[in-house]
């Protein structure tokens, strides 16, 4: 009997090298609503640390944390204004170091959600692009000349309205934002 297409595919799948995460259970946490350790109404990094034993009991191996970086929170924290800073509402870098240390003690991994598709309009690069749209940082974004009544495309923003907005400080320019 000859090998079918499905048999070949199954054989290839079984022959694939297994990676460390293939047999792990991951649990995504939106920190703001997970566990509030200090009673301010906002979940935080110490709250995640306090619940590591509970998560381990559930069989969780990987804790995937949604963005905790500095943000104006126009997009639930996915509009990051500083990738190097933890937003104070979630804690400090020391809190993050403590979480990592405690997770390691439990043979757990921490996976950070890294949003590289877009940033906040308060991010340093966007602010520099607004200062000089034809400069280095202007090339990091889709910035086009603005013609009254015309848009480069008819795409809609995820939150409604066109994806094109006037570039702050430059009425003759427009920038594209999907969110």
Residue ranges and their predicted role:
Residues 2-7, 12-179:
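Acidic/aromatic-lined carbohydrate-recognition and catalytic surfaces
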